[in-house]
């Protein structure tokens, strides 16, 4: 019976509203989960940088700094997406409250742009496509955008020099923090201690590479 009603009269508006809100909540949970996981990665990477800085291992500090830069960039992207999702939610709620939907919704083009921007994020792609379908059924948007994946691969693509500059800032931050009181430290005693605790370069490099690969895998998992 419900199937016949839907075939004749179209989807029930209240049911569509529930579905839309459910998809919005799902997207919100996905973003919050990604932000929490990225925060854990940030903290872990910062600790690794500090540990390497204490050993005066600038090479490893720079290696971890590059990873921290990528993590920070992804975090900023997700944080911005959370604000965009809130904007989408408010516009949809306003349309539902006023019961105007597509016929009188003046900002549907702006809404489509924001939805399309969120679809470009791999973390939200599936659920945002689901939202687009529900919005089409409700008439809030007239069509799905075809070029949703056009810039997924190059979002935030930057010049190497700009990346190096940001990485250098991170390196300077932690190395300056390490050596800001260097005048107060007896140079001879420091050298003696370092000789006693010296670790083979091969082991340091292997450990650094292992940690970097682990962080990259976790970041890749978050992105996909």
Curated annotation (Swiss-Prot):
Lineage of producing organism: Eukaryota, Fungi, Dikarya, Ascomycota, Saccharomycotina
Miscellaneous note of the record: Present with 1890 molecules/cell in log phase SD medium.
Domain of life assignment: Eukaryota
Function (record text): Class E VPS protein implicated in concentration and sorting of cargo proteins of the multivesicular body (MVB) for incorporation into intralumenal vesicles. The lumenal sequestrated membrane proteins will be targeted into the vacuole after fusion of the endosome with the vacuole. Acts a component of the ESCRT-III complex, which appears to be critical for late steps in MVB sorting, such as membrane invagination and final cargo sorting and recruitment oflate-acting components of the sorting machinery.
Keywords per UniProt: Endosome, Isopeptide bond, Membrane, Protein transport, Transport, Ubl conjugation
Organism: Saccharomyces cerevisiae (strain ATCC 204508 / S288c) (Baker's yeast)
Main location: membrane
GO-annotated cellular components: cytoplasm; cytosol; ESCRT III complex; multivesicular body
Membrane topology: Peripheral membrane protein
A GO BP entry: endosome transport via multivesicular body sorting pathway
Pfam family, one: Snf7
Keyword Ubl conjugation carried by entry: yes
Subcellular localization: Endosome membrane; Endomembrane system
Transmembrane segments: none
Identification of the protein by name: Vacuolar protein-sorting-associated protein 24
Annotated crosslink Glycyl lysine isopeptide (Lys-Gly) (interchain with G-Cter in ubiquitin) location: 203
Family: Belongs to the SNF7 family.
């Amino acid at each position: 019976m419900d199937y016949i009603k839907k075939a004749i009269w179209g989807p029930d508006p209240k049911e569509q509203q529930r579905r839309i809100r459910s998809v919005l909540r799902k997207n919100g949970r996905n973003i919050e989960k990604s932000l929490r996981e990225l925060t854990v990665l940030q903290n872990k990477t910062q600790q690794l940088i500090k540990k390497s800085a204490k050993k005066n291992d600038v090479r490893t500090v720079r290696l971890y700094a590059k990873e921290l830069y990528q993590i920070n960039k992804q975090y900023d992207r997700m944080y911005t997406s959370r604000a965009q999702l809130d904007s989408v939610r408010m516009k949809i709620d306003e349309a539902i409250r006023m019961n105007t939907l597509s016929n009188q919704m003046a900002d549907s083009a702006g809404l489509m742009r924001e939805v399309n921007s969120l679809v470009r994020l791999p973390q939200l792609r599936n659920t945002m496509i689901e939202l687009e379908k529900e919005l089409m059924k409700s008439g809030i948007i007239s069509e799905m955008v075809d070029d949703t994946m056009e810039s997924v691969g190059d979002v935030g693509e930057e010049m190497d020099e700009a990346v190096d500059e940001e990485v250098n800032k991170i390196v300077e931050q932690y190395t300056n923090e390490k050596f800001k009181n260097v005048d107060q430290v007896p140079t001879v005693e420091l050298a003696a201690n370092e000789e006693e605790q010296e670790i083979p370069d091969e082991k340091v490099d292997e450990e650094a590479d292992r940690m970097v690969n682990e962080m990259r895998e976790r970041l890749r998992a978050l992105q996909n």
